[in-house]
Amino acid sequence: MKVSLGNGEMGVSAHLQPCKAGTTRFFTSNTHSSVVLQGFDQLRIEGLLCDVTLVPGDGDEIFPVHRAMMASASDYFKAMFTGGMKEQDLMCIKLHGVNKVGLKKIIDFIYTAKLSLNMDNLQDTLEAASFLQILPVLDFCKVFLISGVSLDNCVEVGRIANTYNLIEVDKYVNNFILKNFPALLSTGEFLKLPFERLAFVLSSNSLKHCTELELFKAACRWLRLEDPRMDYAAKLMKNIRFPLMTPQDLINYVQTVDFMRTDNTCVNLLLEASNYQMMPYMQPVMQSDRTAIRSDSTHLVTLGGVLRQQLVVSKELRMYDERAQEWRSLAPMDAPRYQHGIAVIGNFLYVVGGQSNYDTKGKTAVDTVFRFDPRYNKWMQVASLNEKRTFFHLSALKGHLYAVGGRSAAGELATVECYNPRMNEWSYVAKMSEPHYGHAGTVYGGLMYISGGITHDTFQNELMCFDPDTDKWMQKAPMTTVRGLHCMCTVGDKLYVIGGNHFRGTSDYDDVLSCEYYSPTLDQWTPIAAMLRGQSDVGVAVFENKIYVVGGYSWNNRCMVEIVQKYDPEKDEWHKVFDLPESLGGIRACTLTVFPPEENPGSPSRESPLSAPSDHS
């Protein structure tokens, strides 16, 4: 039982605890600590009971204090007064690492728990707090710095953070500069940045709203401000993404700069850009830091599908914005697709085969292949398949694409094709032992795994493994359940098989809610939690180690569905997380690093070198 006295000034509370010997009372004063602190401060002011005098390193001003008080607040003073050091017996101690402004701030804080900070006294206070190990004061200094960062002082705050190793402040300054770099360019404040911070900014994927040409010109301005800075030219230019500039910008603005023609490193950077732009089909397997999209925004992306209403096939490419909790559109395909295959190489999205018209028999399968470049939000067509195919599986493995099985107007397919981006061509590799369609696949350990599907109108439970190095198929342990039109993905060292459908009895289809994972090491299947709702012919993607199953068709409900279910492998739990904008079957999904959509339309910074007029190249 707790009892508080009505007189708030006393600040007393009592805890009553009954016992055999009578009631024991425990009292707590809420004001005692502050009263004691005030008492010690008054003793210090009056010079009473002080047992040591501190002298700052930059003068003769003296500060009488109490050893016990200083030792209780600082490990530095505790070690000095109790650790057998010579200062333990001295009555006057000179502190060479602290000036009088900083020492006074520290002593005032220890005796009052109060601290006033401004930019004039901050560094003196920081230096003293760091030297004397007064952690609360260090924390107050960090808060003061972070709360006051602006365009005018961010460079100076960054210098202070670096000098005193204030990691949180340094990180905040980096983020602030990245977010506001265009403004710093316009004011010229960026010219005050040290090389290390400017190089970090120019290398960052989080740097937005600046073209590579603007960044190059800014780097040149910084280098030319002072002669010694020219020593950093090559190191700084390594952070400019020259391959993403247009050819005319490289010729008109970059090659005209003297050091870009004379410095060997800079010359090689221009050669790299030229070679990259001359080989557009090879770009997915030529990716480097200098060719990557300047974005740290990775999202779940969906493509195509057939709409529930009117059975119209979609050509929409969408990303899910987790913060806004809404879908945003990217550049749509030139033609609609469903039952297609998608895969990602080097953050380029390939869309292969499928159908443009609704047709459950696959008789309208196509062979065309398109590639989406998120850096410019643009599509381009690449080499077509050797065979039209739909209801097939597509994997990206070792820089190649593999299109496995499927069906077409000619019937079910056992053939497998491999796309080589370096040659921009498809070639046949070892085919499957039997034709399959409606199967699923994933990759792990340099191998491609294909599960289930339908062969000669019969649902399968087999698992096959393809080794591209030997061009051979191997049989592995079969699934515990037959299924087709399911999905498959890899998380860690486990290969997950999810959903799909199979025959109920002899003539009707049934959703398969059961799921399982395969261990390649053990060649063994293990059941996991069942789906909340049936989904077949879906999109599947792994995002932040969670599995997202998108849209599809529910055979039990006889309709396309709009739901997105998420599976957490660590918790073995399913959750319905959000919906598609509309119900879509035969949709596909992946994860892709993209620009937020508001940065895409009409932005000159997103102009593809490939779209440059030929008379300027």
From Swiss-Prot:
It comes from the Eukaryota. Residues 50-119 form the BTB domain. GO terms for biological process: cell division; protein ubiquitination; regulation of cytokinesis. Residues 154-255 form the BACK domain. SMART domains: BACK, BTB, Kelch. The keyword Cell cycle applies. InterPro entries: BACK, BTB-kelch_protein, BTB/POZ_dom, Kelch-typ_b-propeller, Kelch_1, SKP1/BTB/POZ_sf. Kelch repeats lie at residues 300-347, 348-399, 400-446, 448-493, 495-545, 546-595. PROSITE patterns: BTB. SUPFAM superfamilies: Kelch motif (SSF117281), POZ domain (SSF54695). One of its GO terms (molecular function) is cullin family protein binding. CDD domains: BACK_KLHL9_13 (cd18449), BTB_POZ_KLHL9_13 (cd18239). GO terms for cellular component: Cul3-RING ubiquitin ligase complex; cytosol; midbody. Pathway: Protein modification; protein ubiquitination. Keywords: Cell cycle, Cell division, Kelch repeat, Mitosis, Repeat, Ubl conjugation pathway. Residues 595-617 are annotated as: Disordered. Signal peptide: none annotated. Component of the BCR(KLHL9-KLHL13) E3 ubiquitin ligase complex, at least composed of CUL3, KLHL9, KLHL13 and RBX1. Interacts with AURKB. Substrate-specific adapter of a BCR (BTB-CUL3-RBX1) E3 ubiquitin-protein ligase complex required for mitotic progression and cytokinesis. The BCR(KLHL9-KLHL13) E3 ubiquitin ligase complex mediates the ubiquitination of AURKB and controls the dynamic behavior of AURKB on mitotic chromosomes and thereby coordinates faithful mitotic progression and completion of cytokinesis. This is Kelch-like protein 9.
